[in-house]
């Protein structure tokens, strides 16, 4: 039995946002102990605005965008925003160095990076510093003008794009650790993510009222399930 059919992550996300907008979607505690609790409805609004931001930056269906972020709500917004747009998320561990970042960006041909302040400095937008070359770096987590949150909130809450991904389209490319060889990019489709999520939910007997605690890094495939 095909339990995914032609559905995509975008389809699943929109259905959840429509049917349970007031349910808690995410509870996040940052390194300073501050806690944010966001509903499906709140995150759905941010996801569309994020997708519109990427579209305005020239990202289109099938394009790769690197996410050099830790475990933050902004990382989740970017992951879903890219899947809604039909683009491909390429998550990078916050501790990954410049050489590996350069290698990954060249291989996936990413021209846009969303980074946090601790990682943004390794990227070179003008060719003057010898850092990792990229067309555009958006810095998240500062709340400052021109940062991710500001640019996101200045976008509308209605989609400005009309292309839809298919279930066979890549949703993310996750790179292996490289412990035995050069890191390999593993292409994960919308169908792969949906099936894995359904299977894990069944295996763990998850119910709608349950809460799932994860300490996995957001760049890890297990986090994205």
Q: For each predicted feature, which ranges?
A:
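Conserved AMP-binding/adenylate-forming core of the ANL superfamily
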Residues: 22, 26-72, 76-80, 97-102, ...
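Conserved pre-ATP/AMP-binding loop-to-beta segment of ANL
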Residues: 21-24, 156-175, 181-182, 205-211
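Conserved ATP-dependent adenylate/AMP-binding module captured primarily in the ANL superfamily
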Residues: 94-126, 196-213
């Amino acid at each position: 039995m095909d339990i995914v059919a032609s559905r995509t992550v975008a389809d699943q996300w929109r259905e959840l946002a429509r049917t349970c907008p007031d349910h808690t979607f995410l509870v996040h505690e940052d390194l300073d102990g501050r806690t944010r609790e966001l509903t499906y409805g709140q995150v759905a609004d941010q996801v569309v605005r994020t997708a519109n931001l990427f579209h305005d930056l020239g990202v289109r269906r099938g394009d790769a965008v690197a996410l050099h972020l830790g475990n933050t709500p902004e990382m989740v917004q970017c992951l879903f925003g890219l899947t809604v747009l039909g683009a491909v998320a390429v998550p990078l561990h916050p501790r990954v160095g410049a050489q590996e970042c350069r290698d990954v960006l060249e291989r996936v041909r990413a021209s846009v990076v969303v980074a946090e302040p601790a990682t943004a400095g390794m990227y070179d937008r003008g060719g003057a510093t010898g850092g990792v070359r990229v067309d555009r770096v958006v810095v998240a987590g500062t709340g400052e003008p021109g940062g991710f949150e500001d640019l996101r909130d200045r976008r509308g809450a209605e989609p400005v794009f009309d292309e839809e991904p298919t279930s066979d389209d890549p949703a993310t490319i996750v790179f292996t650790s490289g412990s035995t060889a050069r890191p390999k990019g593993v292409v994960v489709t919308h169908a792969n993510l949906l099936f894995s999520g359904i299977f894990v939910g069944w295996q763990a007997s998850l119910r709608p009222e349950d809460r799932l605690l994860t300490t996995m890094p957001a760049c890890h495939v297990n986090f994205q399930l």
